A protein has these predicted regions:
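Beta-rich carbohydrate-recognition and catalytic domains
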Residues: 1-143
């Protein structure tokens, strides 16, 4: 059962560990504290399309699921990465892996949010890093 306050009440579902109401989540990433909220991003597999899911908390126990942060596009699926607070530009910055639809090749992309992570704009020149080698994923950026 899914409760309106966002806490799952199923017998075998974790009570504190964040979990999705439906579909499959994995790879928590981009954990960041910004303007009074902890942000948890994760891979969110919705019918074989990989997004960055998003949840926020003020206490790391009670989580509120937000709309997906970053959606797949014509370049590819959105895989793991990291997020940082860009204080100079008053925004959050996310760096993620693209898994290209046709070739499966991996590259890195970026997106930015100016409203506490509620909406995201992908960098217009994505992908920002490419490489022909396999397993070119999971960028880690920190400040």
């Amino acid at each position: 059962m899914w409760m309106p306050d966002g806490i799952h009440m199923e017998k075998y579902r974790p009570k504190i560990h964040f979990s999705a109401k439906d579909f499959v989540i994995n790879d928590p990433n981009g954990l960041v504290y910004y303007d009074g909220e902890y942000h948890l991003f994760h891979q969110y597999n919705i019918n074989e399309q990989i997004y960055w899911g998003h949840a926020v908390s003020t206490d790391l126990v009670h989580w509120k699921r937000l709309p997906n942060a970053i959606a797949p596009d014509e370049i590819g699926q959105i895989w793991s990465g990291s997020a940082v607070v860009d204080e100079e530009n008053h925004r959050m910055a996310a760096f993620f892996t693209y898994s290209e639809h046709v070739t499966g090749r991996q590259s890195q992309g970026a997106a930015f949010s100016y409203d506490k992570g509620r909406t995201w704009e992908k960098y217009e020149k994505n992908p920002i890093l490419t490489d022909e080698r396999p397993d070119f994923r999971d960028p880690k950026v920190f400040r």
